[in-house]
Amino acid sequence: KAKKLFQFEEKDIAQIELKNSEGMLSLQKDKDVWKMLKPVEAKADKASCDSLAGDLASVKVDRTLEEPNINWKNFGLDPAAIRLTVKLNGGKTHELELGEKDFSSSSVFARVPGQNKVLVLASTLLQSDANKKVIEFRDKSVLEFQRDQLKALDVVRKDKEFKFEQGEVPRAWTPD
């Protein structure tokens, strides 16, 4: 039976550092808001960050391979394709390196630095999230506002202009 690798919950995560083929990415969580610290300081995409954090908190080890002289290259772990560092609210840190998928592509090889064993992780969701491009972790909002604060909207397109105002009934928009 697969067992949980790390003994923390998603809510305990304060920071995630991710190194993949894209480079280094650093994400920090303050209450419920994610912020990108590296490669640039910017607001982060909540869904992408929550997904990665959830995968890290719930990742399970399907089986463990322990041999006296492990050839890490055979598992894509020398060097590792992906390196993750998780910092918890209490200050504790956890690290994980991800390598290749197994022959069935349903599991991924991994290791905790300093441990002389290959972990076979039960899911490749973590690998998929950790392989995302930096842009996928950035907030893509063009304008930020609370929906109930919006009273009117003007849309200008070439030779046409559209004006909308909120009516008496909430969510009822009428052309001006």
Functional labels for PLM-detected ranges:
Residues 1-176:
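A short-motif feature that recognizes glycine-rich, charge-decorated loops
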